[in-house]
Amino acid sequence: MNKKRLLPNDRKQQILDAAIKVAGRPGGWSKLTRDAVAKEAGCAEGLPSKYFGTMISFRRAIMRAAVVAEELGVIAQGLAAGDKSAQKADPDLKARALNTLAG
């Protein structure tokens, strides 16, 4: 299989998109790992660390991206876990996210 080499900003976005997908699964935020994201993104396992550093920095970047994209399931899980970036989201967005937990 011939993998296409992406520009750094494109690769970083690909990793964030994959992370949001992984985090959006039931229980995904609490079980989120760099390896799971790398597998979803189809990239080397070390690339999430290369682009985002620590897991704390990675989670912050993921949640900020989820807030911008209004990924309600990810935001709801972040709120339930006490994530600071999720807590800083717009009140209306937080309310809509929490409604996804209610069913």
Task: Show which residues each predicted segment covers.
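Short, basic, alpha-helical segments at the C-terminal edge of helix-turn-helix-like DNA-binding modules
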Residues: 63-71, 75-78
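Hydrophobic alpha-helical connector segments
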Residues: 74-103
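Generic alpha-helical secondary structure signal
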Residues: 9-13, 56, 95
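Short acidic-hydrophobic sequence patches enriched in Asp/Glu that either
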Residues: 7, 54, 62, 66
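Helix-turn-helix
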Residues: 14, 22-61
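N-terminal intrinsically disordered/low-complexity leader segments
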Residues: 1-10
